A protein has these predicted regions:
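Positively charged, low-complexity, intrinsically disordered RNA-binding extensions
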Residues: 140-244
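N-terminal cationic and glycine-rich segments that engage phosphates or anionic surfaces
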Residues: 1-126, 130-140, 239
Length: 244
């Protein structure tokens, strides 16, 4: 995981502002609905995909009442929300690799919108697999240590004992990586030890990074990420732009 920095390299769907927070909760709620419907259960102990989304929701400070209401809604016979998972891949300025994960009820609406963003601010949308080969799918758990109250060696030992692959200190946070199949078990084990998370989800982690030196390229890349992030169907955006 050398060189991977959650805060510098991953474009997330939640922000500090109330509007961003609300949008993030809406997107997570959509993920919960899909997880319940596809997993056939509202019990995270019997639905690993739901357990993964709940971990993400809790790390994003989504209230438990919201989570429960969304699960109940998904289980209700009157729920007609039908979303499908779609992944788009393309290139930003300077050949930056970009993966877009979306949940949509209308591919004919979503695909042209995503393609337009890539065409206007990047180098175009590519075929499936054109950039995903250069990413690794990993569970990533981030623990805030801004106050310095946590001991790095202790967190490392607890993470490895829980089944994590690695842990590294990244500025004010500890970043723990896991195999995707072990993610839920690691989250549960760390929660039982009293840890809370800044974020916790399955991510696409770049194998290498691209640095931009042109201000025009930086502006275009920033705009591309903003447009993707603000699209209601887009859940996650992963890229290999090495930001300062």
């Amino acid at each position: 995981m050398s060189g991977h920095s959650k805060w510098h390299n991953i474009q997330k769907t939640k922000g500090a502002a109330d509007a961003k927070r609300s949008a993030a909760f809406t997107k997570i709620a959509k993920e919960i609905i899909v997880a319940v419907k596809q997993g056939g259960s509202g019990d995270p102990n019997n639905n690993s995909r739901l357990a993964t989304v709940i971990a993400k929701a809790k790390a994003a400070n989504m209230p438990n009442d919201n989570i429960k209401r969304t699960i109940d809604k998904a289980l209700g016979s009157g729920n007609t929300d039908n979303y499908e998972s779609v992944t788009y891949e393309g290139y930003g300025p300077c050949g930056v690799a970009v993966i877009v994960e979306a949940l949509t009820d209308n591919r004919q609406r979503t695909a042209p919108e995503i393609r337009h963003y890539f065409d206007k601010f990047g180098k175009g949308m590519g075929a499936q697999g054109c950039v995903s080969w250069s990413f690794d799918r990993k569970g990533v758990i981030v623990i805030d240590n801004e106050e310095g109250e946590l001991d790095e060696d202790t967190v490392m030992m607890d993470a490895l004992d829980a089944g994590a692959e690695d842990m590294q200190a990244d500025g004010p946070v500890f970043e723990i990586t896991t195999d995707p199949d072990s993610f839920n078990d690691v989250v549960k084990a760390l929660e039982e030890k009293g840890y809370s998370f800044e974020s916790a989800e399955i991510e696409m982690v770049p194998q290498n990074y691209i640095v931009m030196t042109s201000e025009d390229d930086v502006r275009s890349m920033t705009k591309l990420l903003d447009m993707l992030d603000n699209n209601e169907d887009v859940q996650n955006v992963w890229h290999n732009w090495q930001q300062d």
